Amino acid sequence: KMSSDIFVIYQIDNSEKNREYRCRSYEYQIQHGFMITADNYGTGYSGTATRGMGAEAIRKKMESINPDKFKIRKFGVSDVIGLTEAGKTSFFYVDKDRLVRFNGFFPKSQSGTYLILDEGGYQVAGQKGTWLVSDEVEVDGQRFVQMRSEQTKNPPPSIILHESGAFVTQTALGFDGEAIRKMRAFLQGPKPELLHHQKFFENGTAERAKESGTEQ
């Protein structure tokens, strides 16, 4: 028996704040700073596909099945296909005439690496457009990455993020002395929420802080 690929259809949730972003194009979301992340989506459908079937074929199949099968709304533009092939999950945004492969749907992937070197299509909260991971460095045992804007016309300066996805600083000169100083200050400062959750996982405590109330 051939092993199958697993796929999940994520759909923008029914919250009032996300109403105007439903059924919009990828470009619209990027321009308006709507974060295409699990925070704004719920699971609409999940299933298995013949190995190697691919996202395009899954899209066709989803377009042909009964709309009532979806938990949130009929399948269509603004949905996300999460396809796991041989243990690796890729995410595709359903646009009108294409599928856009992008990164960063889950804040931190199960494998532990969220910001993958030389991968693009990441959105960064509070920053316009999409970003590519262009460099990485370790400071005091913590990983930081440099992100380059994928905007071709007048791109904004590069930025440095902590591996948790937290913003550290803008940089014109990559990991220079000034940037390293800011990374150290970041590590000394109050820890962002994400790190707070990671601490619990590291301690192996069942306690999941505030997050537990909001789990899908």
Each language-model region and where it sits:
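Short amphipathic beta-strand/extended segments with alternating polar/hydrophobic composition
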Residues: 20-34, 92-96, 160-161, 168-176, ...
